[in-house]
From Swiss-Prot:
It is found in: Cytoplasm. It catalyses: tRNA(Phe) + L-phenylalanine + ATP = L-phenylalanyl-tRNA(Phe) + AMP + diphosphate + H(+). InterPro entries: aa-tRNA-synth_II (IPR006195), aa-tRNA-synth_II/BPL/LPL (IPR045864), Phe-tRNA-synth_IIc_asu (IPR004529), Phe-tRNA_ligase_II_N (IPR004188), Phe_tRNA_ligase_alpha1_bac (IPR022911), Phenylalanyl-tRNA_Synthase (IPR002319), tRNA-bd_arm (IPR010978). This is Phenylalanine--tRNA ligase alpha subunit. It comes from the Bacteria. Mg(2+) binds at residue 262. It comes from Prochlorococcus marinus subsp. pastoris (strain CCMP1986 / NIES-2087 / MED4). GO terms for molecular function: ATP binding; magnesium ion binding; phenylalanine-tRNA ligase activity; tRNA binding. Tetramer of two alpha and two beta subunits. The keyword Protein biosynthesis applies.
Length: 335
């Protein structure tokens, strides 16, 4: 009789535990609360484990009955906890959606329009002008060898012209190109004349940063090789380009020196009442052509180079090159 009472008592405790646990799980408000319930109900020291320890008072016939009932209660409580957790997640998502609901009657903030950077638009315009004159665009590596950047352009080692531009050397033989002229040499190695190309791209020089200098800037170089090309063709091409880009603006040519052209000239335009250098140019030195296996008696040509930043500054009356690189929207939104 005592065993029957013990069986009834244990079953009663299990039933009470199940009812109370069901209610607590349904009323739980958070994951952490559910985790605490799981530990207090089903943990090693939980209420279910405490009840099951009293099974030792039962006969071998009754113990399986309690064990089976306890196992069913455990499975049911685990399922209830999982279900309530999923319900809490769903409720949280619904609340977030409700809180973040967009009121379509509120005026939109709009999207700020984007535009090309002034340097990019300036370079694109320069390229378009020369393409209209029959030139094609060629590109080359920014990391160059000493040969392509200097020696192939009639600037051998220890030549005094190398003092004209400080260079970023990566090692004894590799450097960051100081001009885009190496593109012209690479192209001529694989393409016989006649040639009309332009080479746009970034170049690097060890200049101190100030209002008119930057260690990194953009350059466009021009190369024309054909029969019977002379300085008048160079002058005509440069004047046509400058008139197309700047409009009717005073231009002058000044004699100058470059190792890879002879004769050479610098080109100035009037800016704010003063002459400002904007291009360097000249007839390609026959030695440069001969090194490439090109007959300099049959083929002649001219080369010219310009800085995109300088052209952009003149076009838009910008007095400091550093403005191009500060990403100041107050400046950029003007273009």
């Amino acid at each position: 009789m005592s065993q029957i009472e013990s069986l009834s008592q244990i079953e009663g405790k299990l039933n009470n535990l199940s009812l109370l646990a069901n209610e607590n799980i349904k009323n739980a408000k958070s994951d952490s609360e559910l985790d605490q319930l799981r530990v207090s109900l089903l943990g090693k020291k939980g209420e279910l484990s405490i009840i099951l320890k009293t099974m030792g008072k039962l006969s071998s016939v009754d113990r399986p009955i309690i064990g089976q009932k306890a196992n069913l209660i455990k499975i049911n409580l685990q399922d209830l906890i999982t279900e309530r957790k999923n319900q809490l997640i769903s409720e949280a998502i619904d609340k977030q959606i409700e809180d973040e609901k967009i009121d379509v009657t509120i005026p939109s903030t709009g999207t700020l329009p984007g535009n090309k950077h002034p340097l990019i638009s300036t370079q694109d315009e320069i390229i378009d002008i020369f393409c209209g004159l029959g030139y094609s665009v060629e590109n080359g590596p920014e990391i160059e060898s000493d040969f392509y950047n200097f020696e192939s352009l009639n600037i051998p080692k220890n030549h005094p012209a190398r003092d004209m531009q400080d260079t970023f050397y990566l090692d004894e033989n590799r450097l960051l190109r100081t001009h885009t002229s190496p593109v012209q040499i690479r192209y001529l190695e694989n393409n016989p004349p006649p040639v009309r190309i332009i080479a746009p791209g970034r170049v690097y020089r060890r200049d101190a940063v100030d209002a008119t200098h930057s260690p990194v800037f953009n350059q466009v170089e021009v190369l024309c090789i054909d029969q019977d090309i002379n300085f008048s063709h160079l002058r005509g091409t440069v004047l046509t380009f400058l008139k197309t880009f700047f409009g009717d603006i005073p231009v002058r040519f000044r004699a100058s020196y470059f190792p890879f052209t002879e004769p050479s000239a610098e080109v100035d335009v009037q800016w704010k009442g003063k002459w400002l250098e904007v291009m360097g140019c000249g007839m390609v030195d026959p030695k440069v052509l001969e090194k490439l296996g090109i007959d300099s008696e049959k083929w002649t040509g001219f080369a010219a180079g310009l800085g995109v930043e300088r052209f952009c500054m003149v076009r838009h009356q910008i007095d400091d090159i550093r403005r191009f690189y500060t990403n100041d929207l107050r400046f950029l939104k003007q273009f």
